[in-house]
Amino acid sequence: KSAPSGQLQLAPEGTVVTVREAADAMIAISDNTATDLLIDRLGRAAVEAEVAATGSSDVAALTPFLTTREFFLLGWGRPDGRAQWRDADVAERRQILAGLAERTIDSNPVDPAPADLDYVGIATRPATADGIGWYANGSDLCAALASLAVGPQNDVVRQILAQNPGGEFDPARWTYAGYKNGNAPGEVAGAWLLTDTAGQDWVISTQLASDTPIGPLDNAAAFELVTRSSSFL
């Protein structure tokens, strides 16, 4: 189980979750545990191969590909693994991740002070400079979403992505809106798949980041830039 956001981290051990249910939860409410279930089902190697296949500009920065649980433990666990991770090569990083397998996360602590994660630090201590996270530029995000739009079972993919459109788009201009966002301390990113009334697909991405300790960024304010700019496409 991972830390919030989401709901599946609160589900009892042994709860059966289908692939579709996990995908729905990952998109609809950014359920981190659902995301990790999908990574586990596919296998880390398959996810890393897909990163390369979509033409990522920096495959090395996404290798090994972290689960959200590993992300939290490395960046804000007690103890955290920032220094060890920062100085490690790929093989050493895989060993570090193997060492996290038995560690657990109390995703709903009664008192966050003695919890196994620094829950205050999650909101205030960015880990980007330590190499902890998922690295992509705007073109990478667009390429990944575009590959889903034309890939296998893209009709199902579109149904899933449409559960959270990430804003209000003019229905007179856009017949479809699908979306996925991501948040980390000091970072907000989002990508949209839009279809206009002529049937043309458009892919848009936005990213905001800071290396300094800041509080949670307002998604609505950040992504309003996209909904407003969509009228100019």
Where are these regions (language model features)?
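Short, charged/polar low-complexity linear motifs in solvent-exposed/disordered segments
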Residues: L8-L10, A52-G55, N219-F223
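Structured C-terminal helix/loop/strand segments within mature extracytoplasmic catalytic/sensor domains
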Residues: L100-L233
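Short alpha-helical "patches" and their helix-cap loops
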Residues: K1, A46-T54, N154-G166
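Short, glycine/proline-biased beta-turn/loop segments that scaffold the active-site neighborhood
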Residues: K1-P12
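Mid-domain, small-residue-enriched loop/turn segments at the edges of structured enzyme/sensor domains
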Residues: T15, I29-D140, A144-L145
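A charged helix-plus-loop insertion that forms the helical arch/lid used to bind
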Residues: E13-V17, E21
